[in-house]
């Protein structure tokens, strides 16, 4: 048997008009025919937690020891305002060691994991920024087409990005919007100063094959 319709209309959920965390009015956005409820407040506490969680995740900076609960504690104590504050947590050594669930060993392991994360590939850094629609696979494609320093990406145009396989106009606009934002540029400069970023080899175009004739030998079955 299959349920085709709820005739009683019971358990119908109302769409919240405000964010339950920051109480900003929510917005419905339509992407590819699907609607998503969105909090437009860039300073929303819940979005801040998710941004930090994303930054330290396995496919991004891959910093072991940072659960979402730990990040919340650090943010609530005022130790983390922006993601680059992670790299100066050693100034709170005593306070961190005195937290519930922490001690000298946990602190040492966390600081070592933070130090290890400073050696990172370009695509992981791009992915860690949380640019709308830019997953790790797309970040890899962009970085291989344009292996630039973080500060140079602000010079890329939508037209240039559209030459990357699989990227559409909305993703290209999202990428350009992020890198041309002045606040984001400050963050990118700080990350450039902190991290040692390995650039991938540039993928060359197929222009070298233009005008050439190829003869295929053998039989086709």
Where do the PLM segments sit?
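Long, charge-rich boundary regions
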Residues: 46-100
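Terminal amphipathic helices with adjacent charged low-complexity linkers/tails
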Residues: 12-13, 90, 103
